[in-house]
């Protein structure tokens, strides 16, 4: 990720008291530790850390829906990055739960679609010979690169609208049912 963008994101999120999670290699470094067995506390200046490490994705998270929702317009103004995935309640007002609300942020060019496109080129597979199964907006770019698109029934509406078929939900083993 762009280092200055990471610093800007941190400067937006940290004063609001939300968790700021940086995925680095195989670990996560955070401003507020919630899962000590899975993440480390940021113990140095954010600039020092960012310039010494390769951060591949950032996430902002909090149990307060409004806090995260109000940060989104500020995040969207940061150059070279974009929100890649977000909690379903931020997309669909019908979806409510008591879980942590989050937004995943990464380089503007990183997405599932680019990864699938590159893989198809390497393996010399035609688009028409491929299938993708998805449930959230981060799957839309992938759908553009495959021949047949499937959504699980608990997918967000915009994903369902872009598919050729809808299978059972994740909780009902929809992927396995479709593949059989």
Regions found by a protein language model. Give the residues of each.
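Conserved acidic, metal-coordinating active-site core of Asp-based
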Residues: 8, 12, 16-19, 23-133, ...
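Mg2+-dependent phosphoryl-transfer enzymes with acidic/Ser/Thr/Gly-rich catalytic loops
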Residues: 103-180
